[in-house]
């Protein structure tokens, strides 16, 4: 149960790694929060007695097979992985039904919430309570079709993140295998309208790599077009799915296109803080100052 997990010795041990300021179980090369901190001067606060945030990663089913994420399609609608996901979703919802304190539930870190039958089940069954808010990360291709089926989640949405690794039809459809450029734009327009109605934060996520680094400014313009609050430009990580990661790793100083990448990165600096409302954040990219 959730109560057993939260009160376990393992939970306390992991929490102690934050309490003592070492963050020894965290990856400081990938965590955007740690990258932005100088831990020599950071004094962590004592852990809260009540849980205020839960991040769900209980199903890796997705309607895309992006080269930066996986080698083949992963989709569960039966079998042991699916059954486990449903059981976990039910246990979490049972706990939320009785939880009295403000909490935010993040849906989708491994698969797509609107493609996944497990996450759909979770959203269908999640309790309607004023203390529960949500955040979602999605590729957005199925958002317009399925968001109306979970109106309570959308009404209580704090933040919607959309992963999109191309700013043109050619690049998008090359890197988001299974996606269509016209479909993503239709959904981005719908999200922009829904944001005005419900007031959630809208974040676009862009994994920078050899095949799309030349469109960094274009994705910023796309974000502006659809009223995004932020465009996050993130470094591509090696998840052991690339046979040619070194070729794609534009961040390697020895890469033949690295200098061009650095020059393009410099050119988008004005979007990062010189506007009244900067739109771009680069938590895992290196910008020369």
Model-predicted segments: where are they?
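Short, conserved loop/helix-junction motifs that constitute active-site signature segments
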Residues: 98-100, 126-130, 151-156
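Radical SAM enzyme [4Fe-4S]-AdoMet core and its adjacent flexible, acidic
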Residues: 57-59, 78-87, 151-289
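Iron-sulfur (Fe-S) cluster-binding segments and ferredoxin-like electron-carrier domains
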Residues: 1-4, 34-43, 71-80
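Canonical Radical SAM [4Fe-4S] cluster-binding loop centered on the CxxxCxxC motif
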Residues: 48-50, 55-87
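Membrane-interface junctions of multi-pass transporters
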Residues: 1-33
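Local cysteine-cluster metal-coordination motifs and their immediate loop/turn environment
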Residues: 23-35, 61-71
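Distinct, well-ordered alpha-helical segments
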Residues: 117-124, 145-152, 215-216
């Amino acid at each position: 149960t959730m109560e057993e997990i939260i009160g376990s010795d393992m939970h306390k041990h992991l929490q102690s790694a934050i309490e003592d300021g070492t963050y020894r179980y965290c990856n400081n090369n990938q965590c955007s929060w740690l990258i932005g901190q100088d831990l020599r001067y950071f004094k962590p606060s004592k852990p809260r007695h009540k849980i205020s945030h839960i991040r769900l990663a209980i199903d890796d089913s997705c309607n895309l097979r992006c080269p930066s994420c996986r080698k083949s399609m992963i989709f569960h609608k039966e079998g042991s992985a699916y059954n486990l996901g449903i059981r976990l979703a039910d246990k979490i919802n049972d706990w939320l039904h009785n939880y009295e304190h403000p909490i935010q539930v993040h849906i989708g870190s491994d698969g797509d919430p609107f493609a996944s039958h497990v996450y759909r089940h979770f959203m269908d069954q999640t309790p309607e309570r004023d203390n529960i808010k949500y955040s979602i990360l999605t590729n957005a291709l199925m958002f317009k079709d399925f968001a109306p089926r979970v109106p309570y989640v959308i009404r209580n949405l704090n933040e919607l993140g959309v992963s999109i690794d191309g700013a043109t039809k050619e690049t998008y459809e090359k890197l988001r295998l299974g996606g269509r450029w016209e479909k993503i734009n239709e959904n981005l327009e719908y999200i922009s309208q829904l944001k005005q109605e419900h007031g959630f934060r809208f974040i676009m996520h862009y994994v920078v790599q050899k095949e799309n680094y030349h469109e960094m400014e274009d994705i910023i313009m796309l974000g502006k077009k659809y009223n995004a609050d932020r465009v996050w430009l993130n470094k591509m990580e090696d998840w052991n799915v690339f046979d040619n990661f070194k070729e794609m790793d534009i961040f390697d100083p020895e890469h033949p296109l690295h200098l061009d990448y650095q020059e393009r990165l410099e050119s988008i600096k004005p979007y990062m803080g010189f506007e009244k409302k900067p739109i771009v954040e680069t938590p895992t990219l290196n910008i020369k100052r």
